[in-house]
């Protein structure tokens, strides 16, 4: 089984990591865990002021910051993984990565956003569920 775990470094994403470790049957000998972190692009003005290379460097620094505790946690628990970093619309990048990597399951944390917030904005998790062609497991 190939699993794509989306992380943003939040405590909700950590709960998804905890879930993987607590359910070792998901990660059998042939399983592959891909961990993705998606960042929204810096506004165009920032790219023009600081330069495209510097903007990419800032994205890389942020990705390393997010992945560091994830890597430590997975290695401590002897979980094999591969990290993916993307820049773009979060939902699209997660769904595209699932398709391009031929994953069987997307795993992500969520949180109890209030009814008004859901109605006005929706959540990344809800939109991934709506747009994904593979099952999505949300961990609360």
Locations of regions flagged by a protein language model:
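Phosphate- and divalent-cation-binding pockets in alpha/beta enzyme and binding domains
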Residues: 15, 93, 115
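Structural beta-alpha unit
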Residues: 72-106
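Absolute protein N-terminus
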Residues: 1-2, 140
């Amino acid at each position: 089984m190939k699993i794509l775990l989306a992380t943003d470094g939040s405590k909700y994403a950590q709960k998804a990591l905890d879930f993987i470790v607590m359910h070792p049957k998901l990660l059998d000998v042939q399983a592959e865990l891909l961990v993705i972190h998606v960042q929204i692009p810096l506004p165009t003005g920032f790219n023009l002021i600081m330069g495209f290379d510097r903007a990419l460097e800032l994205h890389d620094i942020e990705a390393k910051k997010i992945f560091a505790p994830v890597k430590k946690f997975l290695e401590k628990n002897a979980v094999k993984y591969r990290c993916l970093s993307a820049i773009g619309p979060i939902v699209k990048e997660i769904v595209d990565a699932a398709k391009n990597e031929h994953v069987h399951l997307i795993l992500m944390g969520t949180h109890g956003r209030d009814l008004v917030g859901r109605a006005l904005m929706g959540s990344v998790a809800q939109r991934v569920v709506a747009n994904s062609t593979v099952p999505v497991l949300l961990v609360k």
